[in-house]
Amino acid sequence: MSASPPLVVITGPSGVGKDTILDLLREDLSNVYVPVTATTRKPRLSEIDGVDQLFYDNEGFDSLIKNNSLIEWAEVYGERYGVPKSQIEDARSLGKELIVRTDVQGAFSIKEYDPSSVLIFISPPSLESLSHRLEFRGGITVDQIQSRLSAAELEMEKADLFDYVVVNETDNLEGTINVLKDILIDLGFSLKNN
């Protein structure tokens, strides 16, 4: 039996399509597990605690930090997010192939935790296209869009520190998924038999 593939970290600016990409990749990968992150933000209407996120109040999240239960955590847009160690350790003990979705700083923290991890940065084709995506997605103000674009610019400056950079071209999601599948297959991830 071959060695299990490395932990893969996928990150990129807000609005670049990380969640959509991960949802589509999960359809094609047979043994993948995407850890559920802990957060202090309130659940969205359709979200389920323990499935979409692990929802904590501030006191509960503080306890996770105090007990060193998170691989990494950060405050993002006024809410805290983190990756529980138990999510990684439990999945590994079951032989799962891991893809973690986090922010740029979290990616570097995970690399410190697991130096063999592989970091993939999902980039928009341009800041202008990212702005259009954020506007189309809705639910955030013009000021919030500007804040996210400023953060995206700083994040994109760090893209060359990643093992792979994949551009999520507008109107070519299938192409993005195919590039990522090729990377994951090369790393040893298992595809479903279709």
Language model: regions and residue ranges:
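Post-Walker A helix-loop "phosphate-sensing" segment adjacent to the P-loop in P-loop NTPases
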Residues: 27-35
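Walker A/P-loop
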Residues: 19
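Hydrophobic anchor at the beta1->P-loop junction of P-loop NTPases
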Residues: 10
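Conserved phosphate-donor/acceptor-positioning beta-strand/loop module used by diverse small-molecule
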Residues: 98-103, 112-136
